[in-house]
């Protein structure tokens, strides 16, 4: 847990350094970065594959879980637009254990920056939790509340706004990854177990937050 909170602190420091209240405050080097609603291939892939995805996973899910997935799908534009509205942070975009190197077994060095974007900083925390820890309510609440404390000390944001950012973040990159890999042909998968494992992990968050 100490190591996890250390990661959260370090990624928050990056988020806070590159925090942009509005479009005017963007520094020149960040102006070319895309926001979620400008990353067109996310929604294109989801729209093209959603029916196939539901068909493939329906036997693994209960009726309420399928309803949750369909509700997310039907509200993608709203979700993406809200997560693309300022204030925004410079985000890693694919934060998970394999993309973190620990210097001296303590200081995290973040690797693989190919998904960088402007987004809500907590989107990095959400993906880190899904990909890197076993689902545990106490740990999840500890991490999310700790990040909120760091954020609240620097910026004016209500807990309701923060929770909305968390829920939206659950429905963007994690949802994209889930639909993508669970609709992929088996012969294209390097790890045939990953899609189902990711689906099951993500559904635990959906069942908890929605």
What would you call each of these model-derived segments?
Residues 192-200, 206, 210:
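Eukaryote-biased recognition of C-terminal alpha-helical segments
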Residues 1-10, 20-92, 201:
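ATP-dependent phospho-/nucleotidyl transfer catalytic cores
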Residues 15-19:
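Protein kinase-like catalytic domain
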Residues 27, 84, 154-160:
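Short helix/loop segment immediately N-terminal to the Walker
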Residues 118-155, 171-192, 197:
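Active-site activation/catalytic loop segments of kinase-like enzymes and analogous catalytic loops
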Residues 2, 156-172:
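All-alpha amphipathic helical-bundle segments outside canonical DNA-binding/catalytic cores
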Residues 74-121:
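Active-site acidic catalytic loop and adjacent metal/ATP-binding pocket
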Residues 1-4, 85, 115, 130-137:
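Short, charged/polar micro-motifs that form catalytic or ligand-binding hotspots
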